[in-house]
């Protein structure tokens, strides 16, 4: 996995502080704080840690952890890596500003197959609107007043307009949508693990259900080009962090040398150095054995009392 992206790079934007705000529609949104500062970084340098953190946020929901614990984990992830870029991830193209409307393939969040551009943008700017004018396929966007936002716009001026817009401080993503995406990734991992762990215990119909579930996992492959830096480097054109995570997760899922595993004790996702590793740490292994031993002792004590 690391070797695959060793000579690769990409760019994404994260802010140093995020908050959860409630919009007029009653929905909760994650958005940068008013005075938060943006930072441009290369997500491929942190690919393994990012995917593991995303999966473990999802596992909190799979294991029905308290809502405040889940909320804290989601905000921590977003502060580490930025929002998912759902605005550019959901449409058929991240360049939707160049079209008369926004066209949407089937997804978890929006039922409509197409939307007016203004209505679609409103889903991601529930608090402060950007100064955008849209007429047919023509669109213009005026950025003024905030030097940081102007600098971000200039940095990504060759990217699709919508991607650059999603890096602005006004941008927000629905909390429930972000949470659902983390849960979907965790569900995909557990489906894969259960399929192989329980293969001999389940019938062929159940196996087919697992296979169908995994076949639904996928995405549009990102484009890339080669840059001649100190050595030839692949630059991945991720137009959303979601797409980047999806691709990195896919490679990690099929990696036989360092497979993804679920800790038998704490249910935490970890990268294993061996295919048969069952615990994320020596501490978890020891605790598991202690609890297992106590359980046996209780059973024996109960039998003796009988």
Name what the model sees in each region.
Residues 1-270:
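Short helix-coil boundary/hinge micro-motifs
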Residues 245-306:
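BZIP DNA-binding basic region
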């Amino acid at each position: 996995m690391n070797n695959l992206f060793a000579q690769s790079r990409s760019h994404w934007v994260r802010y140093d502080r995020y908050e959860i705000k409630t919009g007029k529609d009653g929905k909760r949104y994650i958005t940068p704080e008013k005075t938060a500062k943006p930072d441009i970084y290369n997500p491929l340098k942190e690919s393994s840690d990012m995917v593991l953190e995303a999966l473990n946020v999802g596992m909190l929901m799979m294991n029905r952890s308290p809502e405040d614990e889940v909320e804290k984990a989601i905000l921590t992830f977003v502060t580490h890596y930025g929002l998912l870029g759902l605005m550019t991830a959901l449409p058929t193209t991240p360049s939707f500003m160049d079209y008369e409307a926004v066209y949407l393939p089937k997804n978890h969040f929006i039922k409509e197959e197409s939307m007016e551009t203004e209505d679609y943008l409103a889903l991601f700017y529930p608090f402060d609107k950007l100064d955008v004018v849209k007429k047919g396929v023509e669109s213009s966007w005026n950025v003024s007043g905030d030097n940081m936002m102007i600098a971000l716009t200039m940095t990504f001026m060759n990217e699709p307009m919508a991607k650059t817009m999603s890096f602005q401080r006004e941008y927000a993503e629905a909390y429930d949508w972000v949470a659902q995406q983390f849960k979907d990734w965790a569900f995909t991992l557990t489906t894969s693990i259960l399929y192989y762990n329980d293969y001999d215990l389940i019938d062929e119909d159940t196996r087919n259900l697992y296979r169908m579930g995994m076949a639904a996992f996928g995405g549009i492959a990102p484009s890339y080009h080669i840059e001649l830096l100190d050595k030839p480097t692949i630059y991945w054109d991720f137009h959303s962090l979601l797409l980047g995570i999806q691709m990195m997760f896919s490679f990690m899922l099929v990696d036989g040398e360092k497979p993804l595993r679920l800790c038998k004790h704490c249910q935490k996702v970890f990268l294993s150095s061996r295919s048969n590793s069952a615990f994320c740490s020596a501490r978890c292994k020891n605790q598991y054995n202690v609890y297992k031993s106590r359980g046996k002792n209780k059973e024996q004590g109960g039998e003796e009392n009988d």
